[in-house]
Amino acid sequence: MQSWPSPPVPGIPGTGRPLRLYDSATGEVRPTDPGPVATMYVCGITPYDATHLGHAATYLAFDLVHRMWLDAGHQVHYVQNITDIDDPLLERAQRDGVSWRKLADREIGLFRDDMTALRVIPPADYIGAVEAMDEVTAAVQELIDAGAAYRVPDEQYPDVYFDVTASGQFGYESRYDEATMLRLSAERGGDPDRPGKRQRLDPLLWRVERPQEPSWSSPMGPGRPGWHIECAVIAGNRIGPVIDLQGGGSDLIFPHHECSAAHAEVLSGKRPFARHYTHAGMIGLDGEKMSKSRGNLVFVSRLLHQGVDPMAMRLGLLAGHYRQDRAWSDEVLTAAEARLARWRAAAARTGVDADSVVQAIRDGLADDLDTPTVIEALDAWAADETLDGSAVAAAVDALLGVRLV
């Protein structure tokens, strides 16, 4: 599937810093240690609605990772999926009286436009679950053959499930206890109480065909895949059995990333699936997480239509630390617009060199993407009328992705 155009990323003098990131699996900020080609998989959208600021904040966080690796001299192989077949998409299409494929294509196109406006570097591989269907069905059959998957004894709908005991370390990525995992499974699309499952936490691999639902042929019979196996297969087949970073929002820690890691590790025989599991915090509005189910969404496209500068949006979302849950408000946007204006005025100045400011940007981002510290240093630069603007503007463009000139 086509992604979106890449923004230009200027080169900046000096040497990039090695990046340290928080790893959900260890609870520690650890160095990333990629080889010449750094590899990253970030879970993409389920395209049944427009991109909201919660989505945008996640993709901006991993865009910073991408930019820091480039600055440190790595090539980056970035893969992102699109969950273009899933229950929420089908439900929304039925509600609106449109085909699920037409709805998905429309929202994917809008997402591309939003990412372009926000100057997010695109993935090298942008893969829909539907286009990877043959790969996914082969992987499900492989898990069945290995004894890691089974059918529930349901005469009408003998769906295929993954046996979580097959991984030998289920739970290591999230570090949640069983009660928490069961609660989150029930809240986030799982079915822990379905009869016939070996373990309550066993996730769905293949849903056999239901009336009035799209389905695909497979060795297991017609049906469609579960969510987690799609990401395991798309990442593994394009990057390899071990990746440097798996990323997404903090709501994906469990069950999605736990289960996709377990699938990938059983399929490849190698562990861990990712050297870092890194997660972005949630964006809230009026005291609640911004989500489609709550209907409290601020859409990127709507703000763009209102004439909001996408660089102000980007700067507003980067004002808080990426791992923190944080609130969006009119005040956040107003502050970001004022800051952007100050920085743009400073970027046009001539004066004494500001190499120390460029180094402060690198140092702050290298320390678990500490954007608040970076922004503080840039505010001080903007306030000092003796400092030159050109080198700092290039660094802000290259590393923060905010265009000042």
From Swiss-Prot:
GO terms for biological process: cysteinyl-tRNA aminoacylation; mycothiol biosynthetic process. This is L-cysteine:1D-myo-inositol 2-amino-2-deoxy-alpha-D-glucopyranoside ligase. A motif ('HIGH' region) lies at residues 45-55. Signal peptide: none annotated. Monomer. Zn(2+) binds at C43, C231, H256. Pfam families: tRNA-synt_1e. A motif ('KMSKS' region) lies at residues 289-293. The keyword ATP-binding applies. Catalyzes the ATP-dependent condensation of GlcN-Ins and L-cysteine to form L-Cys-GlcN-Ins. SUPFAM superfamilies: Nucleotidylyl transferase. A motif ('ERGGDP' region) lies at residues 187-192. Disulfide bonds: none annotated. L-cysteinyl-5'-AMP binds at C43, G44, I45, T46, T58, N81, I82, T83, W227, G249, S250, D251, I283. One of its GO terms (cellular component) is cytosol.
